[in-house]
A protein has these predicted regions:
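Generic recognition of stable, solvent-exposed alpha-helical segments in well-folded globular domains
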Residues: 28-35, 60-63, 87, 91, ...
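Conserved pre-motif I regulatory segment
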Residues: 2-53, 62-66
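Walker A (P-loop) phosphate-binding loop of P-loop NTPases
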Residues: 57
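Conserved Walker A/P-loop ATP-binding site and its immediately adjacent core
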Residues: 80-105, 119-131
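Walker A/P-loop NTP-binding motif
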Residues: 39-45, 60-79, 99-105
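A short alpha->loop->secondary-structure connector
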Residues: 103-115
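Short helix-terminating capping/connector loops at secondary-structure junctions
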Residues: 76-81, 112-118
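Amphipathic alpha-helical transducer elements in NTP-driven molecular machines
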Residues: 62, 117-120
C-alpha cells in the first residue's frame, strides 16, 4: 500500500467516525470537529507538530483521538511511532482513559474497524506521587 492510499483511507476513516459511527451512538455531527480532526491527522501523517485551538464544546478530545486512531490504522511512514497527547488536566487524562477511549474502541470494534480495544497509558511526573 502506498503512502497516498493510506492518507486517503485515514481521512475517510475520520469522516466515517464522525458522520456515521458516533452519530449512531447519539453524538451530534460537528463540522468544526471533523475539520480539526483532519488537520490533526495531516500533522501526524507529515510528522509535524500541530498547535490547534478550538472553543469549548467543539469536541477536541474525540477529534484528536480519531486522528490518532486513523494515523495508526493507516501509517504513512516506515516506522510506527507512538502518539503523545498532553492534556490540560489530570481529570481529562483520566476521562480519556476511562470514558473517551473505551467508547471509541467499542464503536470501532462494533463496526469491524478494530479487533481489540485502543490502548493508552498515562505518564505522570514525580510531583504526582507521595515519596
Amino acid at each position: 500500500m502506498n503512502t497516498n492510499d493510506n492518507r486517503l483511507k485515514a481521512h475517510k476513516l475520520i469522516d466515517h467516525i464522525f458522520q456515521d459511527l458516533l452519530p449512531a451512538h447519539g453524538m451530534a455531527q460537528r463540522p468544526e470537529q471533523i475539520q480539526l480532526s483532519h488537520r490533526m491527522l495531516d500533522a501526524m501523517q507529515d510528522g509535524r507538530i500541530a498547535l490547534c485551538d478550538a472553543g469549548t464544546g467543539i469536541g477536541k478530545t474525540y477529534a484528536y483521538l480519531a486522528a490518532a486512531t486513523a494515523a495508526s490504522a493507516f501509517p504513512t511512514g516506515q516506522i510506527a511511532r507512538p502518539i503523545i497527547i498532553s492534556t490540560s488536566s489530570i481529570a481529562l487524562q483520566n476521562a480519556v482513559l476511562t470514558e473517551y477511549l473505551p467508547l471509541l474502541s467499542c464503536v470501532l470494534m462494533a463496526d469491524g474497524i478494530l479487533t481489540k480495544p485502543l490502548k493508552a497509558v498515562i505518564r505522570k511526573g514525580k510531583s504526582h506521587y507521595v515519596c
